[in-house]
């Protein structure tokens, strides 16, 4: 199994249920790693999975900036950001700040379920061991 990785989880309101279902489905993989999430998303994940999640503030109250700061300190190995591409809410932070930082620090980043599943399966196979080089 792969080394301990730090995984960031963010979901817009309309995608929170999807994030819960994703974490239920991949609970056996996620429980081997450190999970970080914006406040409400983290609480909702914990409620349905019993996974331990480090919770930031709510996304619109600065939680997304807290996650971004962890990326800037090269202390994040993967980010799953389930966003609503059709109906973004005014209070929901812009995804682009996180995209930019993940590109700068070469961090695997998913914004939809298909890519998130590929990343989690790769993580479980040990395909992300190269991240160690960047730390």
Regions found by a protein language model. Name each.
Residues 5-31:
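N-terminal phosphate-binding or glycine-rich loops at protein starts, especially the Walker A/P-loop
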Residues 32-41:
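Short internal beta-strands
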Residues 34, 51-61, 130-133:
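Short hydrophobic/aromatic-enriched beta-strand-loop microsegments
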Residues 64-104:
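Mid-chain, well-packed structural core segment of small domains
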Residues 114-135:
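Short, glycine-/small-residue-rich phosphate/pyrophosphate-handling segment
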